């Protein structure tokens, strides 16, 4: 339940300009999650969400990363071109790639040096990433989606 709620929170803050815990709680309640402001507050802390300025006057919740930028545009291209889909099983992230692309995509992910990823192995078209926690797995999935969408 908590994992689903965290996933929904990440989707909501990516889609809407949510500026307060009350706004987020209302959206989650409208989506069928029975949450209080206190629950939302804990979730925000656990997901390491931050408030960022929208226009100098308003703020919104966002995921911020202090990770290093991607080493090369080539890695981004490989990640974008080779990526097919991803799914999670607890703290294991499974990434499907185009046939023969898993090792290259895995190298691109390793080059990101994200602290949440403990390690990864690649086959022909599948990558398995061991991630520190379930919440970190959701964050990594969100980061990968943003990289693919923004490039």
From Swiss-Prot:
Task performed by this protein: Regulates arginine biosynthesis genes.
Superkingdom of the source species: Bacteria
Pathway the protein takes part in: Amino-acid biosynthesis; L-arginine biosynthesis [regulation]
Classification via PANTHER family: ARGININE REPRESSOR
Keyword Cell membrane: no
Listed SUPFAM superfamilies: C-terminal domain of arginine repressor, Winged helix' DNA-binding domain
Entry-linked HAMAP family: Arg_repressor
TM region(s), chain numbering: none
Single GO biological process annotation from the record: regulation of arginine biosynthetic process
This protein's GO CC annotations: cytoplasm
A Pfam short name: Arg_repressor
Subcellular location: Cytoplasm
Family listed: Belongs to the ArgR family.
Organism: Lachnospira eligens (strain ATCC 27750 / DSM 3376 / VPI C15-48 / C15-B4)
The protein's name: Arginine repressor
UniProt keyword annotations, A-Z: Amino-acid biosynthesis, Arginine biosynthesis, Cytoplasm, DNA-binding, Repressor, Transcription, Transcription regulation
Single GO term (MF): DNA binding
